[in-house]
């Protein structure tokens, strides 16, 4: 969905303005008419499509969004502790230096002025405030501790942003190293090796096996290289199209979770996110079944989300939380034993386990990247060494013949 800024006339002919989420401008006008408003002007706020999943506002890129949301939530938590909610929202809207963020908070404030609760007002913008956010705000309003809940939300958002940034930074060096390695080997085989080997061919000298293998590899790269690249691009595009189908995506995500090394990292990422989300929802007095359902929805792996949905159904039928999580085969034994069947014990133990899961996931990422980087360097060095030896061997043989 997109976010539209509108100006409209109400039944009394007074002008009003605000934000409306809709699939299109036509849909936005229809929604405004259903509210008894006559649209005068509607402008789409670019870059504000609602994400499929994740915990973010919908203006701009995700790594900026998380920090914006954390700052907004922190400011709101500070203000609601000392000011009425309407004044706090007005102050946050005016404080923001980003027009789109300011307009959204003004729209939320307008809903609150109309008589909606803060959670209901934010729920009118699902592309900006997720179910997790709205559920926690609703729990905070019901318990009378909205400021404390908002502070937990800010902490949660910052931790999510920090983990995402850590993963991205950790992946930069291996990706760059891989691209450089492929580029260097391709240039050597397609441009350098043919010119050197051509001199040996003119000498009509019997070439060593390594040199003949190098010549074959060079010919293959020059002849079939562009086709291989084209096939790879087509394969990636086809794979992406295939993953758009739910049944194929579910099978792929299931296999991904149980691969030897990558699977452990993927499971760690998803279980850490689930534990962290369940922790913050439980501590905010959100009902357990609702907390489990929302915690599953924030996961990026479809199979993990499916299995945890089954766990939620099992708990609804009377199975203990410990047993339901055990049946998913996703969580490590220590976590299953730390989470009790009753919500009271879950509220006590999930939070530290969420911290443990974050630490374990970071350790797993460090281990995987620590193994990958030296393996890539050694492989690159081995290939370059083979190329150098394949070129030097005929030269050394030629020098030997000339000395004889």
Curated annotation (Swiss-Prot):
GO CC terms in record: plasma membrane; type II protein secretion system complex
Pfam family, one: T2SSF
Subcellular location(s) per record: Cell inner membrane
Transmembrane segments: 172-192, 223-243, 375-395
Cytoplasmic compartment segments: 1-171, 244-374
Keywords attached to this entry: Calcium, Cell inner membrane, Cell membrane, Membrane, Metal-binding, Protein transport, Transmembrane, Transmembrane helix, Transport
Positions that bind Ca(2+): 97, 151, 155
Protein's name in the database: Type II secretion system protein F
Organism of origin: Dickeya chrysanthemi
Gene for this chain: outF
């Amino acid at each position: 969905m997109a976010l539209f800024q509108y100006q409209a006339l109400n039944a009394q002919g007074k002008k009003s303005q605000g934000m409306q989420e809709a699939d299109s401008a036509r849909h936005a006008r229809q929604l405004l008419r259903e509210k008894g408003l006559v649209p005068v002007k509607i402008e789409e706020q670019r870059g504000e499509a609602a994400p499929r999943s994740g915990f973010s506002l919908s203006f701009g890129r995700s790594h900026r969004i998380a920090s914006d949301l954390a700052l907004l939530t922190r400011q709101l938590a500070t203000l609601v502790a000392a000011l009425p909610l309407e004044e706090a929202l007005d102050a946050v809207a005016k404080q923001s230096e980003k027009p789109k963020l300011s307009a959204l908070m003004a729209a939320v404030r307008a809903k609150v002025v109309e008589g909606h609760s803060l959670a209901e007002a934010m729920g009118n913008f699902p592309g900006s405030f997720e179910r997790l956010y709205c559920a926690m705000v609703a729990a905070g309003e019901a318990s009378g501790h909205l400021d404390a809940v908002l502070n937990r939300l800010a902490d949660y958002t910052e931790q999510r942003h920090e983990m995402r940034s850590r993963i991205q930074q950790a992946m930069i060096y291996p990706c760059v190293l891989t691209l450089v390695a492929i580029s260097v080997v391709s240039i050597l085989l397609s441009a350098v090796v043919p010119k050197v080997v051509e001199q040996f061919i003119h000498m009509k000298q019997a070439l060593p096996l390594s040199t003949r293998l190098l010549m074959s590899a060079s010919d293959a790269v020059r002849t079939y290289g562009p086709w291989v690249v084209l096939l790879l691009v087509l394969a990636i595009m086809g794979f992406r199209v295939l993953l758009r189908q739910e049944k194929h995506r579910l099978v792929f995500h299931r296999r991904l979770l149980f691969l030897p090394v990558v699977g452990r990292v993927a499971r760690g990422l998803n279980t850490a996110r689930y534990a962290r989300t369940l922790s913050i929802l439980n501590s905010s007095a959100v009902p357990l079944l609702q907390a489990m359902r929302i915690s599953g929805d924030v996961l990026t792996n479809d199979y993990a989300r499916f299995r945890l949905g089954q766990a939620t159904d099992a708990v609804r039928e009377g199975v203990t939380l410990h047993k339901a999580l055990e049946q998913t085969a996703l969580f490590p034994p220590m976590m299953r034993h730390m989470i009790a069947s009753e919500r009271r014990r879950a509220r006590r133990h999930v939070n530290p386990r969420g911290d443990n899961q974050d630490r374990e996931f970071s350790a797993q990422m460090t281990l995987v990247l620590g193994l990958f980087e030296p393996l890539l360097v050694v492989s690159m060095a081995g290939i370059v060494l083979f190329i150098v030896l394949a070129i030097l061997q005929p030269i050394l043989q030629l020098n030997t013949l000339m000395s004889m």
